[in-house]
Amino acid sequence: MDFSKFLADDFDVKDWINAAFRAGPKDGAAGKADGHAATLVMKLQLFIQEVNHAVEETSLQALQNMPKVLRDVEALKQEASFLKEQMILVKEDIKKFEQDTSQSMQVLVEIDQVKSRMQLAAESLQEADKWSTLSADIEETFKTQDIAVISAKLTGMQNSLMMLVDTPDYSEKCVHLEALKNRLEALASPQIVAAFTSQSVDQSKVFVKVFTEIDRMPQLLAYYYKCHKVQLLATWQELCQSDLPLDRQLTGLYDALLGAWHTQTQWATQVFKNPHEVVTVLLIQTLGALVPSLPMCLSAAVERAGPELELTRLLEFYDTTAHFAKGLEMALLPHLQDHNLVKVVELVDAVYGPYKPFQLKYGDMEENNLLIQISAVPLEHGEVIDCVQELSHSVHKLFGLASAAVDRCAKFTNGLGTCGLLTALKSLFAKYVSHFTNALQSIRKKCKLDDIPPNSLFQEDWTAFQNSVRIIATCGELLRQCGDFEQQLANRILSTAGKYLSDSYSPRSLAGFQDSILTDKKSPAKNPWQEYNYLQKDNPAEYASLMEILYTLKEKGSSNHNLLSASRTALTRLNQQAHQLAFDSVFLRIKQQLLLVSRMDSWNTAGIGETLTDDLPAFSLTPLEYISNIGQYIMSLPLNLEPFVTQEDSALELALHAGKLPFPPEQGDELPELDNMADNWLGSIARATMQTYCDVILQIPEVTPHSTKQLATDIDYLINVMDALGLQPSRTLQNIAALLKAKPEEYRQVSKGLPRRLAATVATMRGVNY
């Protein structure tokens, strides 16, 4: 039987009984079912008995074990209580121990302080006693003249004195000790000088040790500097008393200094802790003690050279100095990190310092030099052809002078003199343009372009025009080379002075300028020989201007700048003057003939047979000589203007496109000549002819009817010439022709739509009512 179901939570008696009967015999009768039920009852009774028995045993065991558990719990409670009492006692012991220990440590600290004070007092007493002992013995020690023993005594006294700072007579003891050190120094000085002079390493080491112990190392170095400085100064004196030129004297001095650097560095490395700094200071002191001084020698030599050669001589001297500086830089460079950079900067200043006054006024010196040299370039000669030739040759000379000035600026100022250079170049170009202008005026006079003889014969002479074309080509070469030079100048300025421009610089901002200086100071150590900058401190305004120039060149690019804008403008004006000269040389002959028009008496005087020809048609009249000469001259212009078309000259082409001709086309006119420079010139001369012709016609006071027809015939002839050349006659000339041809009774009708003043003037000439 399965009794486990009695333990289930959902146990149901009926279900269990039904299930038990279903599991019994299937084919039994009612009697068997009763038997099966009796069996089940019996089994249940047996099972109940077993359960009761098991419960009884379990209860009995529980009752037996209960006193033991209670006793264990009671014992555990007693042990816990005892443990609590013990922990309280331990806590109190710890607290008491802490209090006792704290008091003990405080006592120990106080005892230690007392001990330290007692030791300090004892040491002070010992040192005081030692000072007294040493002070008493020092005189006897000095009598021995044993420098090592004396030094040891003084070192002991010095150490004792350090313990006696708070004593009342401390200052007196300091004075006494310094006096004793002075006596030792005086006693040792002959031996020191002998050791340094003979370059005795062992003896020098002894003195270095002694003077280090008594804190007198600067005084020992002073002996060292004095010994070797005397030798170098004596060398300079010998050089100055010789007959050698200054550049040779400088070479001798610099060779001696460079030799001293190498020998003394090698020796000082064995003696001093900082040998490179010691030898650097030796050179600084030597350069500063030269008699006569280098600035004085340079000034005297430059003054003797005179204005013409002062800059040349100065650069020769500077080359010698720069060569020496390069030698020193190469000597210092391998050990630059071992050097005191402050002292190296002082050495750089000492080497280049004598040139600073000249570098600061470099711009003025360069300007004077360039003006003297450009004044020596001849531009005017007796003959026009020679003058034109000199103008052509002068271009190369001009830009040769300018390029040489740029080289001098880069070499002498390392680009820092750029502002002065630009001013000097501006003056150079201005002076050259002035000379060139004077030469053009001279050529005008020699060609008699401004003085036209009233009765001179009409002669064609194209020499002046051909010379003018060569001058225009020269102007084109000037403009071309000026553009190239300006580009080269910008690149050179950036390559030489660009290193001085800080990345943090902002233009026109003092704060940004100062920030850039601070940034430069905070930047990693650089080579002082390459960073020498005389301008920033001595002329900050010019330095700020230089920074703006460099910033502009860097930001906008070296091809987009206006370094020589004023000079370019002046050269463009020069080109314009050359154009005017060429134009006047062509137009002179035409103007000469046109000026005769208003002076002719035939306009208002009745000629022989005039009454017979009044009614003749206009075609029976022929143009007068003056207009025929002009017409033939204009017809020959294309042949003589042909060089503008056939000549392949880039400079001439540049000048022609840059120049502007007088008498530009009227508004509304067709401009076919603009595509060809020769046609452009032909059109300008033609318009000048027509305008001048109109002006002189309107100056005629009175014309007879016959003269009116003759004048109209002359105008028609000129208009036909213009048509033959493909040029457009001016409206004013056409209007005058129409007014001259109009019959008196039709004059008012013809003049409608024409300029009122023009119509009135022509009416007055003809005597027509208007």
Swiss-Prot record:
Specify whether Amino-acid biosynthesis is a keyword of the entry.
Answer: no
Topology versus the membrane:
Peripheral membrane protein
Q: Which InterPro entries match?
A: COG7
- Assembly and oligomerization: Component of the conserved oligomeric Golgi complex which is composed of eight different subunits and is required for normal Golgi morphology and localization.
Annotated family: Belongs to the COG7 family.
Which GO terms of type biological process are on file?
Answer: intracellular protein transport
* Source domain of life: Eukaryota
What gene name is listed for this protein?
Cog7
What is the name of this protein?
Conserved oligomeric Golgi complex subunit 7
GO CC terms of this entry? Golgi apparatus; Golgi membrane; Golgi transport complex
Origin species: Mus musculus
